[in-house]
Amino acid sequence: MTLLTTWPESGPETVVRRTSDPAEIAAALAPLGVRYEQWPVRADVPADADSDTVFAAYGPEIDRLNAEEGFTTVDVLGLHPSDDPEYPVKAKAARAKFLQEHTHDDDDEVRFFVSGSGIFYLHVNGEVHAVYCEKGDLLGVPRGTTHWFDMGTRPAFTAIRFFHEEDGWIGSFTGSTIASRFPDYDTIHAGHVGSAA
């Protein structure tokens, strides 16, 4: 279940908002220019599906979003626990790349979760909004929005990424250490999954 938690940027001691209601999440994010919607989940798509399988399953949704937003490049990014001895190294490097606060000057950051989960932290208007996204969630973060993404210490997700530019993901890092002051993916995931049980 998707979860939105909002705190003051000063720290996570006070929770301003916490909701799993999709309509409330969309309404809270819309004034920030953030697009949130849920797409139908394709039960026949394996968690670690390859790009061709994902594109075939979500073709109509991808085409609709490309037509609405003018995206020119779409790809699939996935990372899943494995017995490969390189997995821990790859997972750590992938997590570190996105975990520091950054912006995108030339493109929005739009992701659809085919499987698994991850958290986008949006640092906007004096608040930090942690959006715990999971299978079926589409999140569009407008260019220029300060944010970071945490996939956890054992990433397990597949996501469709949408770009206006062929260069793909290019982050402009702020140098802020704010991400270290807020609960990380592992902490939020453990509490969220535990509370849903």
From Swiss-Prot:
Regions crossing the membrane: none
UniProt site positions, description: Important to generate the dianion: 111
EC number: 1.13.11.54, 1.13.11.53
Molecular function as annotated in GO: acireductone dioxygenase (Ni2+-requiring) activity; acireductone dioxygenase [iron(II)-requiring] activity; iron ion binding; nickel cation binding
May play a role in metal incorporation in vivo, annotated site positions: 101
Disulfide bridge map: none
Pathway(s) per entry: Amino-acid biosynthesis; L-methionine biosynthesis via salvage pathway; L-methionine from S-methyl-5-thio-alpha-D-ribose 1-phosphate: step 5/6
Sites where the protein binds Ni(2+): 102, 104, 109, 147
Biological process (GO), any one: L-methionine salvage from methylthioadenosine
Superkingdom per UniProt: Bacteria
Keywords, comma-separated and alphabetical: Amino-acid biosynthesis, Dioxygenase, Iron, Metal-binding, Methionine biosynthesis, Nickel, Oxidoreductase
Binding site for Fe(2+): 102, 104, 109, 147
Database matches in Pfam families: ARD
Record's function text: Catalyzes 2 different reactions between oxygen and the acireductone 1,2-dihydroxy-3-keto-5-methylthiopentene (DHK-MTPene) depending upon the metal bound in the active site. Fe-containing acireductone dioxygenase (Fe-ARD) produces formate and 2-keto-4-methylthiobutyrate (KMTB), the alpha-ketoacid precursor of methionine in the methionine recycle pathway. Ni-containing acireductone dioxygenase (Ni-ARD) produces methylthiopropionate, carbon monoxide and formate, and does not lie on the methionine recycle pathway.
Annotated family: Belongs to the acireductone dioxygenase (ARD) family.
Name this polypeptide is given: Acireductone dioxygenase
Organism for this UniProt entry: Streptomyces avermitilis (strain ATCC 31267 / DSM 46492 / JCM 5070 / NBRC 14893 / NCIMB 12804 / NRRL 8165 / MA-4680)
The organism's taxonomic lineage, starting at the top: Bacteria, Bacillati, Actinomycetota, Actinomycetes, Kitasatosporales
